Amino acid sequence: MDWKNTFQPLAHTQNESLPELMMTHVSDWSAITMIGDDKKSYLQGQVTCDVVTLPNDESTLGAHCDAKGKVWSIFRLFHHNGGYALMQPKSAIEVELVEIKKYAVFSKVDIEQTSDVVIGVMGASADQYIDSISESQGKVRVISGGTAVQVSDNRWALLVTQEATEALVSSSTAEKVSEALWQYHEILDAQPNLSKAEQNEHIPQALNLQAIGGISFSKGCYTGQETVARAKYRGMNKREMRIVSGTSSDVLSLENTIELERSVGENWRGAGRLLNVYQFADNQAIGLMVLPNNLDDDVQLRLTAQPEQIWNILPLPYSLDEE
């Protein structure tokens, strides 16, 4: 049996507990890898996070921007197979690969999309499982066939070869679930995922990167730095990413744009579109979207295509003040 067919949807409501150990194939994710003598200095001059100070056993979020500070890619950066991996939504990589390689001809660096697979491990027993397949400690660990990276409490992403994936999937007793549950946890943790549809639209602070360790304001120059610094020191950022929740009578899928409106007095005005969404078995749904940062937390939202469905803003799991 093909290992990819072992992952099944797990219908549940917000009030139901999830299995203690779940494994999924995050098929919508991949990674860009970077090797070569100049990999560190080259990447340091391209991205918002500090590459030079990144330890082998830790990861960091980061963004790659254009010269105007608009984001091409949001990624999780970590050491992988003697180089770096920038793990991110697969749909963003086609454009991002071209942009991140733009000046590589002048450096000793090889940049490509990996053929490795992203496997997600989550649940109360996730850390214990990772301990069982690794011999080291830390938030980034070398494992058979690749690397295990902690992305939040009790949640790990494994970037591993096809062969290693088959062995992991067949040997693990974890509940094999669809990647929708991985995205559910991404939403709960308010982790920004930038797909192809959202590229080149937002500055990093509109996606909360300053609050989750994705921007270094003390490193040297990088592409788009002026805009990012101006947003911080002159207060020019007017947007933020929030968790939103409501109901839908239709199936919600990011394959179709999901737009929301916000109430303005007795009228409604376009608010934006969902960056990520997860739908429960009882038609409740939760998602992430970029909104104006001057909205009251109790402002009402609604689905543009289903105006009778009212949505609300939920609290973030972190402060939006810079770390």
From Swiss-Prot:
Entry keyword annotation includes Cytoplasm: yes
The family line of this record is: Belongs to the tRNA-modifying YgfZ family.
Q: Which GO terms describe its molecular function?
A: folic acid binding
Q: What is this protein called?
A: tRNA-modifying protein YgfZ
Q: Which InterPro entries match?
A: GcvT/YgfZ_C, tRNA-modifying_YgfZ, YgfZ/GcvT, YgfZ/GcvT_CS, YgfZ_barrel
In Gene Ontology terms, what is a biological process of this protein? iron-sulfur cluster assembly
For this UniProt record, the keywords arranged alphabetically read as follows:
Cytoplasm, Folate-binding, tRNA processing
Physiological role: Folate-binding protein involved in regulating the level of ATP-DnaA and in the modification of some tRNAs. It is probably a key factor in regulatory networks that act via tRNA modification, such as initiation of chromosomal replication.
User: Binding of folate: at which residues?
Assistant: W29, W182
Q: Which PANTHER family match?
A: TRANSFERASE CAF17, MITOCHONDRIAL-RELATED
Q: From the record, give the cysteines joined by S-S bonds.
A: none
- Indicate where this protein is primarily found: cytoplasm
Cell compartments where the protein resides: Cytoplasm
* UniProt key word Cytoplasm: yes
Q: What's in the GO CC field?
A: cytoplasm
Name the species this protein comes from.
Vibrio atlanticus (strain LGP32) (Vibrio splendidus (strain Mel32))
